[in-house]
From Swiss-Prot:
SUPFAM superfamilies given in the database record: Zn2/Cys6 DNA-binding domain (SSF57701)
GO cellular component labels: chromatin; nucleus
Name the record gives this protein: Uncharacterized transcriptional regulatory protein C1399.05c
Location relative to the cell: Nucleus
Organism listed in the record: Schizosaccharomyces pombe (strain 972 / ATCC 24843) (Fission yeast)
Major localization class: nucleus
Length: 529
């Protein structure tokens, strides 16, 4: 019965929305009997989507425009019969006019809308729907809980957030080479400008947080990053904590059966944003803009009956990353206590490894052990405790291999949409193995513990895999691959100055190192002070 009620409510809501949209149709769309997607009510220029894409005057852009009622009720029935034909004609007309860029009408439209991907003639409605289909299928359903068709999602974002609309198109362009070659840089510039504007607002929209979380998971394809994503995600976290938007993320708590699917979306957005920020703290070797209360808030998602296995995966990763972060920020690394904490974590979260979802939390668990034992080598060396170093070396090798094995267990489809945190784990594990190979070649480690030939073959397999899944030369996968390939060459030549467990002093060229920044694949250390 509850399901029936929800269906009725949803249907009623949809009908109400459609009536409102029909009443607000502009003169041009009403004349053509086609759907009219008006701009946001907060926008000074409310020109509809169709008029913007065709560079036409729109009556909704007129501040004196008022809502008119349809004089003839029979017009709806007539328009229903010919609507499909008119839609086809509109598409033909749109393509014919899309090449016109110097229309005098463009100068009459407000500067606020110049960042609109439609007005600039970058993408047609068909192309945007195509990109949104890609985005929803590969990214939106998993990371943003998108439960719309491409056309519905375009409608939603066009009225609520041009930033999220541009971000979705930007990420989806990875999978459309022809469109990517044509407009990627332009769309990226739009995203940069919109982010700068949103950061100045006192209460950013929920879609702003969604856009930032997606950019932290899939950083833009460019030679060097214009936006510091660690700083951007940190600003977003502070916005949530200090501004009136905090209420969005607190309203999902509770396990009442009346909660809807959308009630959990803000909680997921918050957790994904925290996850992206914390991964960058590990990868960039920077301080986190989070505290203990933040992680308590993240756990609240489990009180929602709509939480699923992927929510658990994200929460499990947040838990182990925060634990590892605190270990590396402590004055000294207590290995026994670190192992105890990691095993306690495994007891609590290993049930996730039996789920059909990708085992991201398992990858994070092995990565954490890899880091802990590598940092322990530093601690042992500083304390002249050389007796335990062979055991630590063996464990570094073991957990680096386990990390790589877990990554290779991902499905081909999941590999094709790997987020940056998976690429980082693959890169760091491979760099750890290269440091061990180097130590064996310089006679610092017994070759009975480290087998350079086997590890070399595996590292080669890793950087070749990274190149296979890479989108272009600016993709993070390519940058990690180039780093590992060059590092491997330096190690095997054996001409670099020995620095023991830290590997060669200069394993790669400054150009390769600069391209990878701000990621740091150097040896794991305890960050004192």
């Amino acid at each position: 019965m509850g399901e029936v009620e929800r269906t009725r409510q949803s249907s009623s809501s949809l009908l109400t929305f459609k009536r409102k949209r029909a009443l607000e149709a502009c003169d041009s769309c009403r004349k053509q009997k086609t759907r009219c997607l008006a701009g946001s009510v907060e926008d000074e220029n409310r020109a509809c989507l169709r008029c913007r894409s065709l560079n036409m005057d729109c009556s909704l852009a007129d501040p004196n425009h008022f809502i008119r009622k349809v004089e003839n009720d029979n017009m709806d029935a007539i328009s229903a019969n010919i609507n499909s034909k008119l839609e086809n004609r509109l598409k033909v007309l749109e393509k014919a006019i899309s090449s016109i860029t110097n229309s005098p009408i463009a100068g009459q439209i407000s500067l606020k809308s110049e960042k609109d991907v439609f007005l600039q003639g970058l993408l047609s409605m068909d192309e945007i729907e195509l990109l949104l289909e890609i985005f929803i299928e590969r990214y939106g359903k998993r990371w943003l809980s998108v439960d719309y068709s491409a056309s519905q999602y375009m409608e939603l974002l066009y009225t609520k957030s041009h930033l999220m609309l541009a971000t979705a198109c930007l990420i989806a362009l990875r999978h459309n080479p022809s469109l990517k070659a044509r407009i990627y840089t332009d769309v990226l510039n739009i995203v940069d400008r919109l982010i700068s504007e949103e950061l100045l607002t006192t209460s950013p929209s929920l879609q702003f947080f969604e856009a930032v979380s997606m950019l932290t998971l899939y950083r833009p394809l460019r030679l060097s990053q214009k936006q510091d994503l660690w700083l951007l995600s940190g600003f977003a976290l502070q916005h949530r904590t200090l501004s009136s938007t905090k209420g969005w993320f607190n309203g999902f708590a509770g396990s009442s059966a009346t909660l809807t699917y959308l009630d959990i979306v803000p909680a997921r957005t918050w957790n994904h944003l925290c996850h992206g920020h914390l991964v960058m703290c590990m990868g960039y070797r920077r301080h986190a803009m989070l505290d203990e209360n933040t992680f308590d808030d993240c756990r609240n998602i489990l009180t929602n009956t709509k939480a699923n296995e992927f929510d658990g995966n994200i929460l499990g990763m947040l838990s182990v990353y925060s634990m590892l972060y605190r270990m590396l920020r402590s004055p000294t690394l207590d290995l026994d206590y670190a192992i105890f904490q990691l095993e306690e974590w495994r007891k609590e979260w290993c049930h996730l490894w039996e789920q059909p979802e990708p085992q991201y939390s398992r990858i994070a668990y092995f990565y954490s052990y890899n880091v802990v034992y590598e940092a322990s080598i530093q601690t042992a060396t500083d304390g002249n405790d050389f007796a335990n170093i062979p055991r630590y070396v063996s464990m570094v090798q073991s957990y680096a291999l386990k990390t790589i094995d877990a990554i290779f267990e991902l499905s081909a489809y999941d590999m094709s949409r790997c987020s940056d945190h998976v690429l980082f784990h693959a890169g760091f594990a491979s760099a750890s193995l290269l440091r061990l190979i180097y130590a064996a070649k310089t006679k610092e480690v017994d070759t009975s513990i480290v087998q350079p030939k086997v590890l070399n073959d595996l590292v080669t397999k890793i950087w070749k895999w990274l190149l296979v899944i890479s989108v272009d030369q600016y993709h993070l996968a390519t940058k990690f691959a180039n780093y590992l390939k060059e590092y491997q060459k330096t190690v095997n030549e054996g001409t670099a100055e020995s620095t023991w467990f830290k590997g060669p002093l200069r394993p790669v060229s400054s150009t390769t190192l600069q391209a990878l920044k701000p990621y740091n694949l150097g040896v794991a250390t305890v960050e004192r002070g």
